[in-house]
Amino acid sequence: MANPKAKMSKSRRDKRRAQFNARTKAATTVICPNCGEPTLPHRACRHCGQYRGRAVVTKSANS
């Protein structure tokens, strides 16, 4: 059976495990209070451009 040549540090171990968790867990979404579309938490809404009641991203007229 294979044995490790050197001790793996906690940070290196956790970095490896983080990749598995990032791929298996679904992204958390919240409902935008302004337009009602699902969006990522703590980020501006992709549909209306608002974050915490303020317009932070201006939407162009043709989109």
Curated annotation (Swiss-Prot):
Residues 1-22 are annotated as: Disordered. It comes from the Bacteria. One of its GO terms (cellular component) is large ribosomal subunit. Residues 7-18 have a biased composition (Basic residues). GO terms for molecular function: structural constituent of ribosome. Keywords: Ribonucleoprotein, Ribosomal protein. The keyword Ribonucleoprotein applies. GO terms for biological process: translation. Disulfide bonds: none annotated. Transmembrane segments: none annotated. Pfam families: Ribosomal_L32p. Belongs to the bacterial ribosomal protein bL32 family. HAMAP family: Ribosomal_bL32 (MF_00340). This is Large ribosomal subunit protein bL32. It comes from Chlorobium luteolum (strain DSM 273 / BCRC 81028 / 2530).
